[in-house]
């Protein structure tokens, strides 16, 4: 990795160092081990990895598959829990003394850095699973000494046990810290369930901490560089940006550019971004007592350190001798009490560039007295700010916002309260997943849907509606594709999208290329007419939502297709979805859910460079599918003729529209020879091996099921003569799973 800082702190050797948003250790990067290939991935790096679909296996969960967190949480005395957390915040421990006698700043940073990994493009990251406990996050430079914060919480976790998850505890600690300082938060929701191994996520392609070269395509001109998708941070191992400025160059205006981009990729607008920085830096401090090398991060630390890293050799190694980032900034005169002092100091002085005791670039108030108290009773200091703090004053957009808040702190308090709530809950999905007594009213960013305000349809109604759908003139492919388009927008990463809300009929989803708007214009009016006719004639206050009818229509089509293939099946259907309005739908926020590709529909946007088979597995990951479920769905959707635009790629059957295992049987037929098409990019032609006559066409999203050894093993099961019925059953089960992915109310 190349050097990321033109002005890094003095160092005992010449290895790269840099600093991160508020904290980040002045340490050497761990060196990747150079070795001969040891795994299949090492030998064949281009082979699609389906093992990602089987992460977070229940076998690794020590609580067992029957454990229900919501049930356990209901036993929690939340008020007693809150008191204990706040008492902990205000009780300094000798092994890691608290700044100013309070861990508020440390816990705010821990919660912020847990939630701040969230990124909008793929919904990965966030505080929702307790990922900060595991590598690489537990050893990121930006998370230095947060291992101590989590250890400080252990007595709380030990006491309350299964009634509070680590994920909830890590997130709530920051909320409690704010309240301990006198701030009125907007609310807090519990409901985050722990994972038991690292989240499967590409954080970047750089192979050393603090690198930027790969995510910016080799250019690091801070004025012109473009951060690649889906990354949410400017630098490997940082949450957002380098607080010394881009590439360590202390330029507040250039830093503002990076701040705007990275916070925007976390779904924050300019006002929310400014509020988070101002509010987050109102309490606590950074740590750069000296220019020394701290020890290795937790994952690289000696076994006797028991998962604690960054051991500091300076002085006592803690308290006033702590080295975390090399930056030594205390933002206010009251670092344990909520106030408007951050803005009062930011605008009350002119600022001049200086170096911290750790050698990092920061700003010091010009011609100022030493009014900042020392955290451990030492001499007072002059006011200091990070480069990124000064950005809040000099940037032409952030500046007017923060200057307004200087005179109207009540506006800042409200903006921060709502932005913090959004930060802590952005990856939790709809309010129906929230637990506890402090849940705030639904917000637009939560993609709200109306509550059910009518009687739900019963079995006889369901049968009548299925009959009406099948007699409407709409085809099996039309009904299947519409239901799939509605439900498959779901992302299991941040629990967004899905069929509930019927947003398929609203912008932006109605216009997405993958959803074939011209086809929706044919299908949706017919379904809306069936809905209106039913609701007008139903008795007992019963109604059917369009969201429910779209799913029910698709299920009716699957049942018909199975029956046409000789199998009588019933596709499970659970009513209870409601229809959102356009006013309840943030068009810009939903835009990031638009699929680049959907291998289940054999769709890819023109010019897509990522291999289609890789994008297919990624889509399956979002839909929380296993490899067998993905395989069953592909085989079924191909025979149901549900491809985008009516494409025949992968439709390996002479009876399209009939649910059968023909896709698998014909894929494995050794009488077919496959070659790349000479006419169409990313298409393969299958010809009769003996005669050379054309038989089929396919994409990589089809042929991967014959080329990948793991997927081929599953295909062979479904192609067997004695497993035709099993395939139908497995397809239906996987179909229902996708249709219900966002039905958190079903439990």
Curated annotation (Swiss-Prot):
Crosslinked positions (Tryptophyl-tyrosyl-methioninium (Tyr-Met) (with W-112)): 240-266
GO cellular component terms, semicolon-separated: cytosol
GO molecular function: catalase activity; heme binding; metal ion binding
Assigned EC number: 1.11.1.21
Gene Ontology biological process terms in this record: cellular response to hydrogen peroxide; hydrogen peroxide catabolic process
Record's cofactor remark: Binds 1 heme b (iron(II)-protoporphyrin IX) group per dimer.
Regions that span the bilayer: none
Posttranslational mods: Formation of the three residue Trp-Tyr-Met cross-link is important for the catalase, but not the peroxidase activity of the enzyme.
Keywords, in A-Z order: Heme, Hydrogen peroxide, Iron, Metal-binding, Oxidoreductase, Peroxidase
Gene3D superfamilies with a match to the protein in the record: 1.10.520.10, Peroxidase, domain 2
Binding site for heme b: 281
Purpose: Bifunctional enzyme with both catalase and broad-spectrum peroxidase activity.
Name of the protein: Catalase-peroxidase 1
């Amino acid at each position: 990795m190349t050097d990321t800082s033109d002005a890094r702190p003095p160092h005992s050797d010449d290895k790269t160092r840099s600093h991160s948003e508020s904290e980040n250790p002045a340490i050497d990067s761990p060196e990747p081990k150079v070795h001969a290939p040891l795994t299949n991935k090492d030998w064949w790096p281009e082979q699609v990895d389906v093992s990602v679909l089987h992460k977070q296996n229940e076998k690794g969960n020590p609580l067992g598959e029957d454990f229900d967190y919501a049930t356990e949480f209901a036993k929690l005395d939340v008020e007693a829990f809150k008191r204990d957390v706040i008492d902990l915040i205000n009780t300094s421990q000798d092994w890691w003394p608290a700044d100013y006698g309070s861990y508020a700043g440390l816990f705010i940073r821990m919660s912020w850095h847990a939630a701040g990994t969230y990124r909008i493009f793929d919904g990965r990251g966030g505080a929702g699973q307790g990922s900060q406990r595991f590598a690489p996050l537990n050893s990121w430079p930006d998370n230095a000494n947060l291992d101590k914060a989590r250890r400080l919480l252990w007595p709380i976790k030990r006491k309350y046990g299964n009634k509070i998850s680590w994920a909830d505890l890590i997130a709530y600690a920051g909320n409690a810290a704010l309240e301990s300082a006198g701030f009125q938060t907007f609310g807090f929701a519990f409901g985050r369930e722990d994972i038991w191994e690292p989240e499967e996520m590409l954080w970047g392609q750089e192979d050393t901490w603090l690198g930027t070269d790969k995510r910016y395509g080799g250019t690091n001109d801070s004025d012109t560089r473009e951060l690649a998708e889906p990354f949410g941070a400017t630098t490997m191992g940082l949450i957002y940006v380098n607080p010394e400025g881009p590439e360590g160059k202390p330029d507040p205006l250039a830093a503002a550019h990076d701040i705007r981009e990275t916070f925007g990729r976390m779904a924050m607008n300019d006002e929310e971004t400014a509020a988070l920085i101002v509010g987050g830096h109102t309490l606590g401090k950074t740590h750069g007592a000296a220019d020394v090398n701290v020890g290795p991060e937790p994952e690289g630390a000696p076994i006797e350190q028991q998962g604690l890293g960054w051991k500091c050799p300076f002085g006592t190694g803690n308290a006033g001798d702590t080295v975390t980032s090399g930056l030594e900034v205390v933002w206010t005169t009251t670092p344990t009490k909520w106030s408007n002092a951050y803005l009062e100091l930011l605008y009350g002085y002119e600022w001049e560039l200086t170096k911290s005791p750790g050698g990092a670039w920061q700003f010091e108030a010009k011609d100022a007295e030493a009014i900042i108290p020392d955290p451990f009773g030492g001499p007072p200091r002059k006011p200091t700010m990070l480069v990124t703090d000064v950005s809040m004053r000099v940037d032409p957009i952030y500046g007017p916002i923060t200057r307004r808040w200087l005179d109207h702190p009540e506006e800042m308090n409200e903006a921060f309260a709502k932005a913090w709530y959004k930060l802590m809950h952005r990856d939790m999905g709809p309010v129906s997943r929230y637990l506890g007594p402090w849940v705030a009213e639904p917000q637009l960013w939560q993609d709200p849907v109306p509550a059910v305000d009518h009687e739900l349809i019963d079995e006889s109604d369901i049968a009548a509606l299925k009959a009406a759908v099948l007699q409407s003139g709409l085809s099996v492919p039309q009904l299947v594709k519409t239901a799939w388009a509605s439900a498959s927008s779901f992302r299991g990463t941040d629990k967004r999208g899905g069929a509930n809300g019927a947003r398929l009929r609203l912008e932006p989803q109605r216009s997405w290329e993958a959803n074939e708007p011209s086809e929706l214009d044919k299908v949706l009016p017919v379904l809306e007419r069936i809905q209106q006719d039913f609701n007008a004639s139903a008795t007992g206050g019963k109604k059917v939502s369009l969201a429910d009818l779209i799913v029910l229509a698709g299920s009716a089509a699957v049942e018909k297709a199975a029956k046409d293939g000789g199998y009588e099946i019933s596709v499970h259907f659970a009513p209870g979805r409601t229809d959102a309005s356009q006013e309840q739908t943030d068009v810009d926020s939903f835009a990031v859910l638009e699929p680049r590709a959907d291998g289940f529909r054999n769709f890819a946007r023109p010019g897509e460079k990522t291999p289609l088979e890789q994008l297919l597995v990624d889509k399956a990951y979002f839909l929380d599918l296993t490899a067998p479920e993905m395989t069953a769905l592909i085989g079924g959707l191909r025979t149901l003729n549900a491809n985008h635009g009516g494409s025949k790629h992968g439709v390996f059957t002479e009876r399209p529209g009939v649910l059968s295992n023909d896709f698998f049987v014909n894929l494995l037929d050794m009488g077919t020879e496959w070659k790349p098409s000479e006419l169409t990019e990313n298409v393969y032609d299958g010809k009769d091996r003996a005669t050379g006559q054309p038989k089929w066409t396919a994409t990589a999203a089809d042929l991967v099921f014959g080329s990948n050894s793991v997927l081929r093993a599953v295909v062979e099961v479904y192609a067997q003569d004695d497993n035709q019925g099993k395939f139908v059953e497995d397809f239906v089960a996987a179909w229902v799973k996708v249709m219900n992915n966002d039905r958190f109310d079903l439990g």
